[in-house]
Amino acid sequence: MARNDGIDRTSVRNLAVSDKAVGNTQQHNEREKDSYRNPDIIPQRTAWNVHFKKPTASYTDLFAQLEAARTISTRGLKPDATHYCELVFDVNSAYFDNHGGYEFAKQFYEDAYKAAVQIVGGEQYILSAVMHADEINRAMTEALGREVYHYHLHVVYVPVVEKQILWSKRCKDKALVGTVKETVMQVSRSKKWASKPLLDESGKPVLQKNGKPVLKKSYSVLQDNFFNFMRAAGYTDVERGERGSTEEHLTVTQFKVQREQERLDSLTAQADQKAQSLAKTSQTLSKKEKE
């Protein structure tokens, strides 16, 4: 949850998007709806949104085009396999507001998009990348008496890993059996985001007492990669996102619920502070009346 400690932190979430939900994800990200349940979206500001990669067709059509061009492979996938994922890059609203707002946010997320290309494995696997600049931060707007917007970046992509296809025993040339027939980019969310061995300073795997390697959650690796990329790009005044989270892959709904809960916690804290201040004022007035 939000810490409210005044420290600016990078954050990136990896969301699993089902085939059933991808249409709604597209409508939300590309602002194709006539109305939205999220009251923070200001339609008059939609023109301020910035595409770093604009989709030339629907997300599902783009996926089909990648498959037809053999850029990706779905061979052997289960019927309920996840074909799409979404990265949501974020920093608290105050960070951008303190650096001038919109123009700074555009540059920051242009660099974040470059990080996304590395994380995903290539721009060809990205279906859409758009910075939203039309969602207002109501808490800050109310506190500062002017409009403050919450800038963040949505990147929808196809999760892939390199896979070698070997010649089978049915091959007529027995010398080829077991050798590499072709290399494909296999669609696989689970393998793309598998936990990785934790390495020591010398680059060797850290082992448990039983001799097995200590695994580092893919969520933690993702946070590290984004933070390190942005630091290298010159953003030295931000800190890494929260550590120790057991969170791996949130669904879009779970992510939105979490963000709303963070905002609610922030507003509740502000309300508590105001209540305490009001109580102190009332006590002071009461004492003066008794005098």
Question: Language model features by range: what are they?
Answer:
Residues 1-290:
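N-terminal nicking endonuclease/strand-transfer module with a His-rich metal-binding environment
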